[in-house]
Amino acid sequence: MLFQVRMDVHLPVSMPTDQANQIKSVEKAYSQELQRQGKWRHIWRITGQYSNISIFDVESNEELHTILQGLPLYPYMKIEVMALNRHPSSVRDDDS
């Protein structure tokens, strides 16, 4: 199942820089492992924002939910999820 996920990060201004950097470091390692596994297929930064658009390829809604809740930045995110389906007019074989 493919999902488009928009993640907007809102770290508290009061969070110490060292704590924020530690959370970001763990987040990066977690997200890169999911990318290597093929579950986090794409990630793009939204210009000028602390936000991204990502494409996940997972087995179920529950798996995506578990992955998102596992993100160290999850408590500081606003997340929007859209389920995706292959379009019948697509000329690509690898987009399902």
Swiss-Prot record:
Keywords: Aromatic hydrocarbons catabolism, Isomerase. The keyword Amino-acid biosynthesis does not apply. It is an enzyme of class 5 (isomerase). One of its GO terms (biological process) is beta-ketoadipate pathway. One of its GO terms (molecular function) is muconolactone delta-isomerase activity. Its EC number is 5.3.3.4. InterPro entries: Dimeric_a/b-barrel (IPR011008), MLI_dom (IPR026029), Muconolactone_d_Isoase (IPR003464). Signal peptide: none annotated. It catalyses: (S)-muconolactone = (4,5-dihydro-5-oxofuran-2-yl)-acetate. Pathway: Aromatic compound metabolism; beta-ketoadipate pathway; 5-oxo-4,5-dihydro-2-furylacetate from catechol: step 3/3. Homodecamer. Belongs to the muconolactone Delta-isomerase family. This is Muconolactone Delta-isomerase. The gene is catC.
